[in-house]
């Protein structure tokens, strides 16, 4: 007798520079659909107009579909968080995994919408995740090589898919919010860093301050150090614009200049470290370099991750705004699909919605 799960979620897994992304695109009780008709599947053949085919496939709106991407993020958080917890928490997921929930586009000129999330909640944007999403959609036959625009809660992301592993995307306008912020940390003394926005909020610390070795053999020390700093930022009420939580801490160090301009270590919101160079973190770093006059418009910055993977960032445009100098980062990286699967949810499973943290 064939076993039929009571509920299911369809996903495509990929990694970008070692950091995994799970594209969550369909399922029973899908929050952005009135039925499963027209669902995205990896078996579909590309239509002559691939982008319009993608729009038709995911434009399955129901009465509950919020209009804007920020409203959709809020809806998922308050009304449909089961989709995140079932897909990303153990036993199906892990604290390393970033989710990308596919939605219809917000704007007529875009091809899709994505809400990023992880084991603790929702993200405004995710650079490595967007690269993984685009490569996944391409391998599913739902976009063609060339330009594509994906809407997110923090803005529309224009990108170009090479047709293979490489993606170049234009991130959101990024800026340094505060320079040389001194933070008194018990046991560590005074730690000085910059606060910057690159699609998420970061506290960035140079090697002259942290004096740590950024290598995989030093992970325990790096995690403890950055976790303590993040906790102290919250405890002391040091935040981004409009009181936004600084949920990423990023360390930088010099490296072999023939490979990259610097190496980083990034503590992510869920307590895991980023295996990739971190797209939003690289954008935040670029914003600081622009503010310091170290990178001009059109300038390049190569960022190496803790595992050795690299992103290239370009200061595509620089402008003077209300928040000071702002830079429009262009990022290039590579992603690879690692699996296409259907997650099964059995009503008899006590952990069918994931192993939930204590309330």
Swiss-Prot record:
Alphabetical list of Pfam families matching this protein: Pro_racemase
Keyword terms, alphabetized: Isomerase
Residues annotated for substrate binding in this entry: 127-128, 248, 274, 279-280
Claim: Isomerase is one of the keywords in the record: yes
Superkingdom classification of source: Bacteria
PANTHER family xrefs: TRANS-3-HYDROXY-L-PROLINE DEHYDRATASE (PTHR33442:SF1)
Name of this protein: 4-hydroxyproline 2-epimerase
Organism encoding this protein: Planctopirus limnophila (strain ATCC 43296 / DSM 3776 / IFAM 1008 / Mu 290) (Planctomyces limnophilus)
């Amino acid at each position: 007798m064939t076993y039929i799960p009571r509920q299911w979620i369809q996903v495509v897994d990929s990694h970008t520079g070692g950091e995994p992304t799970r594209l969550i695109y369909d399922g029973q009780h899908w929050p952005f659909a009135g039925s499963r008709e027209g669902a995205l599947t990896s078996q579909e053949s590309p239509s002559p107009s691939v982008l319009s085919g993608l729009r038709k496939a995911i434009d399955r709106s129901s009465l509950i579909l919020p209009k804007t991407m920020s409203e959709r993020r809020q809806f998922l958080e308050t009304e449909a968080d089961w989709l995140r917890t079932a897909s990303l928490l153990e036993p199906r997921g892990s604290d390393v995994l970033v989710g990308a929930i596919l939605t219809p586009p917000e704007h007529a000129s875009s091809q899709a919408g994505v809400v990023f999330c992880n084991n603790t909640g929702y993200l405004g944007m995710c650079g490595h995740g967007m690269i993984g999403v685009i490569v996944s959609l391409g391998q599913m036959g739902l976009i063609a090589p060339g330009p594509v625009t994906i809407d997110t809660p923090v803005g529309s992301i224009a990108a170009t898919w090479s047709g293979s592993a490489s993606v170049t995307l234009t991130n959101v306008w990024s800026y340094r919010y505060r320079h040389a912020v001194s933070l008194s940390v018990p046991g560590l003394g005074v730690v000085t860093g910059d606060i910057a926005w690159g699609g998420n909020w970061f506290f960035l610390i140079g090697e002259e301050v942290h004096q740590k070795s950024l290598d995989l053999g030093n992970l325990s020390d790096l995690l403890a150090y950055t976790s303590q700093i993040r906790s102290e930022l919250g405890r002391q009420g040091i935040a981004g614009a409009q009181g936004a939580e600084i949920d990423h801490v990023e360390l930088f160090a010099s490296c072999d200049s023939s490979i990259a301009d610097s190496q980083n270590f990034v503590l992510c919101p869920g307590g895991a470290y980023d295996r990739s160079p971190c797209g939003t973190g690289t954008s935040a770093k670029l914003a600081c370099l622009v503010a310091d006059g170290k990178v001009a418009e059109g300038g390049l910055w190569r960022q190496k991750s803790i595992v050795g993977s690299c992103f290239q960032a370009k200061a595509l445009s620089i402008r003077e705004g209300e928040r000071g100098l702002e830079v429009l980062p262009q990022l290039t990286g590579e992603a690879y699909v690692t699996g296409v699967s259907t997650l099964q949810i059995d009503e008899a499973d006590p952990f069918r919605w994931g192993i939930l943290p204590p309330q």
